[in-house]
Design a protein with these regions (language model features):
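C-terminal amphipathic alpha-helix
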Residues: 21-65, 104-161
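Short, charge-rich amphipathic alpha-helices with coiled-coil/heptad character
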Residues: 18-20, 78
């Protein structure tokens, strides 16, 4: 009798563990599709980098304020993806790390009251920080994608320069 109960418990345990991988795959694919919605904004990041790095283009204080608002909105929307709802632990940790790192762009872009060319440099650094951290996050998600052996192609591709 004890042996039968033990075998039943073992069978239930193995069955329950088997579904965890599939649930994590689905969660990872859903998360990637949420980030896929940021593709247009990622292209805008590349455009902002080109514009801010080109000294032949004039940039006003209002332009810099618009870029700061773009950065703040991007970060705010990333933060709206609630990590509490993520059951896949490594994905949750990756997301939390991404949010903490990408939030630093707000600090880099802050108006310090310096001359416009210095402010332009600060905002450019902030936008590049956003790009760098988002690319790194996509790479981390690609690794998780490969580890989970998801057959669909990885959907997150950074726009070409």
């Amino acid at each position: 009798m004890l042996r039968s109960v033990t075998m039943l418990a073992l069978a239930i345990g193995l069955t329950a563990c088997g579904d965890g991988g599939q649930a994590e795959r689905v969660e990872l694919a859903d998360y990637a599709s949420k980030l896929k919605e940021f593709d247009g904004r990622n292209r805008e990041i590349m455009g902002q980098i080109e514009r801010l790095d080109d000294p032949s283009k004039d940039v006003s204080a209002e332009d810099l304020e618009q870029v700061r608002q773009f950065i703040a909105a991007y970060i705010s929307d990333i933060e709206k993806i609630d990590p509490v709802n993520l059951e896949y632990r490594r994905l949750r940790q990756t997301h939390k790390t991404y949010v903490s790192k990408v939030s630093q762009a707000n600090e880099l872009a802050v108006d310090t009251g310096k001359p416009l060319r210095n402010e332009r440099g600060n905002v450019s650094i902030a936008v590049r920080h956003l790009e760098k951290r988002t690319r790194a996050h996509h790479t981390a998600l690609d690794v998780l994608w490969l580890q989970k052996k998801i057959e669909d192609p990885f959907p997150l591709v950074w726009p070409e320069e």
